[in-house]
A protein has these predicted regions:
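All-alpha RGS (Regulator of G-protein Signaling) helical domain and cognate RGS-like helical scaffolds
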Residues: 2, 9-13, 21-180
């Protein structure tokens, strides 16, 4: 089971980054909005990078069919990452700094088999669903809301794929909530 410690190791850097860039009390409203959007994007970037790292760490433990699906998911996560980084740069911000592979590995739970990998990556996909779902209304720019909504839909698909590989119902809920 994924512990709070493991999720915090993945999510804490994203939360710190999200708190940055908001500007001071005297910043004009447009600058505060820009800073808020950059903070959200950088938090999402950190979470996407952690998710990609989790799939890569777990890949050797997956059976061939699951490994193929995981690689497809990683390709899509990398596309999300590129779009988010582009969004930060378009706002004249600095994208969040990535961790090393070893830093990610140290923050992850011990993965012993395919079951552990599927459970951990599904937890990360749920975390992403919450991130994008909760952050969507707070984004100021329409193009960023559209990007977040698009990524949200794909993350729901990823979760469905992982649940299917694990032999669980792929649509366990009528609504995507990011919780289990």
């Amino acid at each position: 089971m994924i512990t709070r410690r493991h999720l915090l190791a993945v999510a804490a850097p994203a939360a710190v980054v999200a708190g940055c860039g908001g500007g001071g009390e005297r910043a004009d409203p447009a600058e505060r909005r820009r800073g808020s959007d950059i903070g959200f994007l950088n938090s999402a970037i950190s979470l996407e990078r952690a998710t990609i790292a989790a799939y890569r760490v777990g890949e050797p433990l997956l059976r061939p069919a699951a490994r193929r699906r995981a690689r497809q998911i990683v390709e899509q996560e990398q596309e999300h990452l590129r779009a988010l980084v582009e969004g930060v740069r378009k706002l004249r911000g600095e994208p969040a700094t990535p961790k090393t592979a070893e830093e990610y590995r140290r923050g992850f739970p011990r993965l012993r088999d395919q079951h552990d990998v599927l459970r951990f990556t599904a937890d990360l996909e749920r975390l992403q669903l919450r991130k994008y779902g909760d952050g969507l209304p707070d984004l100021f720019r329409p193009d960023l809301r559209q990007l977040a909504a698009s990524i949200l839909a794909v993350e729901a698909e990823h979760l469905s794929v992982l649940l299917g590989i694990a032999g669980r119902p792929q649509t366990p809920e009528a609504f995507v909530t990011g919780t289990s």
